[in-house]
Amino acid sequence: MPPNTTASSGHKPGKSGRKKGRKARLLVLVLVMAIIGGIAYGAYWSVSTVRASLPQTTGSITLDGLSGPVDVKRDSYGIPQIYASSDADLFMAQGYVQAQDRFYEMDVRRHMTSGRLSEMFGKSQVKDDEFLRTLGWDRVAEKEYDTTLSASTKKYLQAYAKGVNAYLQGKDGKDISLEYAALGFTNDYKPEKWTPVDSVSWLKAMAWDLRGNMQDEIDRALMTTRLGPQQIADLYPDYPYSRNEPIVTQGEYDEYTKTFNGGDGSTGSSTSGTTGSTSSSSGSALTSQLAGLSNVLDDLPTAVGVNGQGIGSNSWVVGGEHTITGKPLLANDPHLEASLPSVWYQMGLHCRTVSSKCQYDVTGYTFAGMPGVVIGHNQDIAWGMTNSGVDTTDLYLEKLSGDGYLNDGTTKPFTSRTETIKVAGGASKKIVVRETNNGPLLSDRNDELVKVGKKATVDTAAPDRGDGYAISLRWTAEDPGTTMDAVFALDKASDWSEFRAASTKFDVPSQNLVYADTKNNIGYTLPGKIPMRGKGDGSLPVPGWDSKYDWTGYIPQAALPYEYNPKRGYIVTANQAVIDKDKYPYTLTTDWGYGTRSQRITDLIQSKIDGGGKISTDDMRQMQLDDSSEIAKLLVPKLLKIDEPDPDVRQAQKLLEGWDYTQDADSAAAAYFNSVWRNILKLAFGNKLPKELRVKGQCLFVSPVDTTGPADETNQKVRECGERDADQAQPDGGDRWFEVVRKLMDDPTSDWWTTPKSGTRPGASNMNQLFKRAMIDARWELTAKLGKDIDTWSWGRLHRLFLKNQTLGTEGPAIVQYILNRGPWKLSGGEATVNATGWNAAGGYGVVWVPSMRMVVNLDNFDKSKWINLTGASGHAFSAHYTDQTGKWVNGELLPWSFSSKAVDNSTSDTLVLKP
């Protein structure tokens, strides 16, 4: 079906426009007829092509390599549950079934992780490939597979690859997915066989998207060119430990044993992490380099999310003493980029009889292209994940000299390699990748990064600038790890001890792991490779020529924070600080999320259990949908006190009277407040930051958000300054900015509250005047976008979700985008709310990141657990399961989640038998 889009330009064409419109409609008609008729190029798009790529879900298929029959049972949403009698058969079948539904997604992903996108999409992807080759994810993955992964993990990866290749056998692109037919118009690309390393490489891409504070590190360095230390501190306030609780509030670090004890309620004391000085290259050269690097990072494709404040998640567990069932309930909803298909693939992997030959009985969310279950439950335990945000990357300034780099006064040779990038429809390109002892030189991959100014200022301790400094990256994922081992170990863990042992293998990305089991235990642990630094705290680039800034190792696993059965009876993780820095000796990061969501979840749980109340599965679901605006609670009382003579602005101001701060899709008050908040950020910070951090782009005349409101003389195009990609620098309006504004409100005459006059709109010299100006600007912004009549305003008209195919849905021909994309949907929720349908205040109100899935696991009866995905099981645009879960996701509904064989049988719609 075509997209259910309701967007309109709002432009009224004249005679010439009508002619163009007729031509456009004629072109669409011709293309549609080509699709139906299957003539000429339209043969690629014909109904037969579409049907050829849809998976067989009934009957039987013979697969060479199976040792016994495998049953694939799908429910009415196309979600598969696989039953086998050996581990190898189970994972081979997983590879086959995921390829049936999602191979195009898998293929694009492996080309991204290996820096080979140009082989599929041509010269437009060469720059991305150059950067990705420099990072070398596939090389690290290959080394990881060869040297660090266990024999059993390799066996499972091989079985999975065998299943994918069994699906590919005898098929060309158009038999696999509609997208290949589109690619066939422009190049002769053919899918190649899947390898075990393709699966391992996916973990590197995931780690990159969840890498932590690199953007903050760049931003702070850029700020030093214009702002003083106190101003930068204003924009990066300390974490509010006294107001927003960290994850771990019980237990202590034992200085004598060098271990953390999270099993009791005692409190510990120790010193905070070391903070060292940083490099002093503060002139135009460093600014140019870092701004260029920021642009490169912004342009890179993402694997699971956006680069920036949107990466987050909620996961919490409530112990049996506080639940209706008397057993734990565990909720999870990772916040990632809105993608089509969803990054998650729901699946069950069941051994008919659990034994040493067949060890798995697990269900949950998987990544297409990787065996095992990433988040979910087995017959004994359940677990969820949120991004920990710990700092696992550092940027180093490198002094280059000839064919080497300076290190402790000595010139060392680069480690170099030559990479060949093949380009569809064009000539191959060779690049040389250079590495220092710290890591690859990112500055080799962008022209801006090599424009090192001759006048760059450095302190007297730095080496002579010569031709300037390069930038290298030190990152934990550049070292071979064991995360793939961890996935399989988690999937079969039966208790807390086995869960903890499995988690120690989860090297990268570092995640907050939340745990519950059927024996009424709950827990939390922080695994991962987290560096210890000789000097520096990871907040700014440091001199690579001085070994005092080298990493000295990783925090010992036994010293990492955890909690087991805390006295309060629940654990909440939502990207807040893991532990109070004054109670822990190691530096985890300087850039936590600020705890807005986590504290709201904590308050919701506490309000429910105060006085002996009990929590149900549906209570957990309702908490996931909470869309209360915490920044509105802070600002609205101030806004209502402002005296505004303009009747139109007063009319909008009255929307805030009696507002309960919830951001429902139909709320006019939420629409107006969020516009005020966006304008506060623009006025207070937009003209005071270095130009490299300001919103990029020129002023544009953009269309109203949609035309679902009444047309009037104001509902025309509006001048919109500063549109930019959603994952660039501040001010994005996330909870860091909540904390910035909260603290600045204590000083209403701060220079941050000044803004110049603009046209007929007044300037401001204090907080109240700036708030007044923001209210005026917001009134006229929404008048232009939604119409003059505020009775027609709603948050959902501004805050809309579009789902776009990950490649051709953004850059393909218009007719292809029309076929592949879906939307819009009007959403409730907002930035830094529990229902985190995030938007970027610098770029508009559209939904950028979302709860990519939601689940609530019932440890009393797994068959009463609930789950939902953002889209559907299928990656095929004409499948009934392409977006069949999206409507329910939008409405906050969850689907039944069958686990027992009886429940699975009762919910089965189709059964496919894979035979040896």
Question: Language-model segments: what does each one mean?
Answer:
Residues 673-779:
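Charged, long alpha-helical assembly modules
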Residues 113, 137, 153-163, 340, ...:
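Stable alpha-helical elements in mature extracytoplasmic
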Residues 90-94, 131, 139-155, 474, ...:
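Second-shell loop/turn segments in exported
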Residues 506-608, 662-665, 676-690, 697, ...:
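Hydrophobic alpha-helical segments
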Residues 89-121, 384-432, 549-594, 608:
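Gly/Pro-rich active-site capping loops and adjacent beta-alpha segments
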Residues 349-381, 385-548:
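Glycine- and hydrophobic-rich flexible loops that cap the catalytic core of alpha/beta enzyme folds
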Residues 50, 286, 587-650, 754-916:
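Terminal end segments
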Residues 2-10, 26-30, 34-329, 334, ...:
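Substrate-recognition/specificity elements adjacent to catalytic centers across diverse enzyme folds
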